[in-house]
């Protein structure tokens, strides 16, 4: 019963439950991560709030987080995706964010800046989402996209429909 209560509390507060392990985030790790989020988001033209929302949801800002499925690091890159993006050390904050933001930029081009599809593709893989689009009806993916939208809106500080946007306000 106590474990169930903690799980419910964690879901309510919005911690990154996808990552099951990894040392707690340290303040210096968060500062370093924020630096690279800003750097790579600008470089790849990805909205900073989207990157922050992914990190919050995926790892709760833990640099060495590892999920039950094997995704690693702040942005929870799967090993195959990390290799494809040239990320050799997933616990390396710079490499993980660089690869993760590059992947988000690629997904944004693939899905024409529709953040719902970008989030779904990030979570489930781009192939299935590219084939089925918004008709993809996996309950886990739908729940993930809803949580990402809520986290994104908090990060961006705007009421956004989580659809297409290239607003300079969110490109900070």
Where are these regions (language model features)?
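Bacterial N-terminal signal peptides
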Residues: 6-16
